[in-house]
């Protein structure tokens, strides 16, 4: 069994994670271990076919969109497409199923925009494989929940020991699967 401890080599990452990114937020809702590993410098996404496939879907599903909309990077978030005129944030997901983590990641983007003076935005989660679009709004209870989640994320990230792994059945398509489950039958 692999034991994950924060070593001297990667303690430098703890001080860099002052801003929570959309990825941190998404991983928090999916797997605390994945969040901890990612935030502490163990990043497996570059070797993941699923991540590569998601990037391709993002780049090819809506080719004409880049003419009208903008990709935005701000305070640790990276928005796929922003429609300035209507204040709509578009987030594209490769998944063949909807996820609460997807909704909260988009709500977090809306929250960060709001904190930076871009008010009254709405979000659209787009699932090209499903041919579905889902509207996402940010409510007052959502804002409170986001503030609580940010504290919880920072607590996990700054812990010296990573959280336990989830059961194999929940990890099949995870880019960290081999890291967490290698050597198991």
Spans of features found by a protein language model:
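Short, charged, amphipathic alpha-helix that recurs within catalytic cores of restriction-modification
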Residues: 102-113
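Short amphipathic alpha-helical segments and their helix-coil junctions
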Residues: 10-18, 84-93, 152-161
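A generic structural motif
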Residues: 94-98, 140-142
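Structural motif
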Residues: 22-25, 101, 162-169
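Metal-dependent nuclease catalytic regions and adjoining charged, substrate-binding loops involved
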Residues: 59, 64-76, 115-185
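Charged, glycine-rich intrinsically disordered N-terminal tails and low-complexity linkers that flank
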Residues: 1-73
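Short connector loops at helix/strand junctions that flank enzyme active sites
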Residues: 74-78, 85-87, 101-104, 118
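Conserved catalytic cores of phosphodiester-cleaving nucleases, focusing on short active-site segments
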Residues: 31, 77-96, 109-111
């Amino acid at each position: 069994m692999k034991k994950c401890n924060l070593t001297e080599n990667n303690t430098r990452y703890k001080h860099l994670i002052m801003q929570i990114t959309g990825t941190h937020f998404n991983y928090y809702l999916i797997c605390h271990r994945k969040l901890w590993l990612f935030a502490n410098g163990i990043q497996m996404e570059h070797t993941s076919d699923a991540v590569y496939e998601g990037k391709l879907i993002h780049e090819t599903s809506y080719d004409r969109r880049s003419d009208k909309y903008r990709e935005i990077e701000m305070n640790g978030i990276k928005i796929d497409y922003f429609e300035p005129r209507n204040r709509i944030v578009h987030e594209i997901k490769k998944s063949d199923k909807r996820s609460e983590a997807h909704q909260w990641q988009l709500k977090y983007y809306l929250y960060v925009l709001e904190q930076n003076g871009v008010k009254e935005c709405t979000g659209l989660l787009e699932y090209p494989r499903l041919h579905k679009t889902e509207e996402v709004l940010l409510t007052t209870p959502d804002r409170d929940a986001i503030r609580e989640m940010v504290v919880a994320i920072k607590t996990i990230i700054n812990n010296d020991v990573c959280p336990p792994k989830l059961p194999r059945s929940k990890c099949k398509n995870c880019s960290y699967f081999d890291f967490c489950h290698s050597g198991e039958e």
